[in-house]
């Protein structure tokens, strides 16, 4: 508690916000990916990609007002996953836009969107590794906000000897697909979450 309070006080004194990182690093799929990186299964890592988006929350105007947005709502999961796997960012470049200037939400009806609903980040990590994250509230997804049944990869890593893809969202993973020079046909690993739920960090 004491260390957390000190961080909170420091952030407040500088006019900044602070929140706990999502618990995506607790999943067995994350652990498997980290193990493969540490073992050198992918060779020299070059790049990674994170993707998370849907058509936007309808239950609250908060997401479209100042201090809301897709990055703190969605992108933060991918940031936690990729910095957890690749280490901290040495440099960051980001761009945000508003794609849908008006929304209808349950608590306020029709509103003007005043915070980004479309964001992209590029991070530079150690050893020349680059990662890219895209998130937004304008992405049609047939699996919806909850992503149930999602079979596409939303986290991907590429190296000189192989590539690896987390299937499903990083907060609700369904497995990891791995391909290497030695085994080019993708193999699925860790299809079970073993009790992991994203709310562990809430």
What are these model-derived regions, one by one?
Residues 1-17:
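Rossmann-fold NAD(P)-binding glycine/threonine-rich loop
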């Amino acid at each position: 508690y004491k260390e957390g309070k000190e961080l909170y006080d420091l952030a407040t004194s500088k006019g900044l916000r602070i929140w706990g990182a999502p618990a995506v690093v607790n999943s067995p799929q994350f652990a498997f990916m980290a193990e493969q990186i540490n073992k050198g299964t992918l060779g020299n890592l070059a790049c990674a990609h994170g993707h998370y988006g849907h058509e936007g929350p309808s239950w609250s105007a908060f997401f479209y007002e100042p201090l809301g947005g897709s990055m703190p709502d969605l992108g933060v999961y991918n940031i936690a996953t990729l910095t957890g796997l690749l280490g901290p960012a040495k440099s960051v470049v980001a761009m945000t836009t508003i794609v849908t200037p008006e929304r209808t939400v349950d608590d306020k009806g029709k509103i003007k969107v005043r915070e980004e609903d479309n964001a992209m980040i590029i991070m530079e990590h150690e050893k020349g590794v680059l990662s890219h994250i895209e998130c937004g509230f304008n992405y049609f997804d047939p699996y919806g906000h909850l992503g149930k049944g999602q079979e596409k990869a939303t986290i991907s890593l590429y190296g000189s000897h192989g590539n690896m893809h987390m299937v499903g969202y990083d907060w609700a993973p369904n497995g990891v697909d791995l391909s290497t020079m030695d085994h080019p046909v993708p193999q699925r690993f860790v299809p079970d979450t073993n009790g992991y739920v994203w709310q562990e960090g809430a």
